[in-house]
């Protein structure tokens, strides 16, 4: 997951490609490729993820944060393939340019998710939205004794306060039209399953679940749904960066991740993106206030 600060409100030129989203082959995911440099494959499993254009989100406008890489990027592409027009935000201008080149259904904009005024301005310029996917997040590693006050404040600013700002900004437009789907990124780590050295991260992700359930309860009668996604360990660029930052034997770290997974592999961002499309679509119209665990059986 991408996170934290940018020069708010600076637009990135949208690149066009012929025919909307570029057609891609079905992506086949094997346990060896998804789990890092660890060859163990407990069940010989492959996952076929379709990438052909469809109409599941036809006519919907989606706002996605942290769309420059990982889960956010794959979700933006998946929503665009499903017929949505996507406003994709991030703090990385180069990543947004690369994303915009993939689809003419994606408009990109730099955004600091901790800047409430910038979020309000973005929604005023590009809204109203049918779908909000809050993907931005920050992972602090350590126990309560390792978490000083600045780390505590930063974690809440990015992981919780930013969702408060975005939800509050998009809700009036959703309520006015009597429809909307808000999808908030939580985590299995600590909020669902106790995980060592994820103290403040887990606290914030538990708060995301509470935020999501409260919004769902308040606006269910007005046609607005709100759900939380709780992934397990997903092989994203940010996870790779955290592994590198630990130093030491990187292969041993990757092995520790896959060893705790009953499926013998890590998740792929494209698998999470498929859940995002489902929750964004009318297929999930009877689903709200739920925590959707997608962790390969880790928390079972």
Curated annotation (Swiss-Prot):
Task: Tell me the InterPro entries matching this sequence.
Answer: NAD(P)-bd_dom_sf (IPR036291), Sc_DH/Rdtase_CS (IPR020904), SDR_fam (IPR002347), SDR_superfamily_enzyme (IPR051122)
A Pfam match is adh_short_C2
Which residues does UniProt assign to the signal peptide? none
Active site positions, chain numbering:
201
Task: Indicate which residues the UniProt annotation says bind substrate.
Answer: 198, 242, 260
Alphabetical UniProt keywords: NAD, Oxidoreductase, Phosphoprotein
What is the E.C. number?
A: 1.1.1.-
- Residues bound to NAD(+) are 63-90, 112, 205, 234-238
A Gene Ontology molecular function term for this protein is:
oxidoreductase activity
| Similarity comment text for this entry | Belongs to the short-chain dehydrogenases/reductases (SDR) family.
Role, per record? Plays a role in the catabolism of L-fucose. Catalyzes the NAD(+)-dependent oxidation of 2-keo-3-deoxy-L-fuconate to 2,4-diketo-3-deoxy-L-fuconate.
Q: What is this protein called?
A: 2-keto-3-deoxy-L-fuconate dehydrogenase
Source organism of this protein record: Xanthomonas campestris pv. campestris (strain ATCC 33913 / DSM 3586 / NCPPB 528 / LMG 568 / P 25)
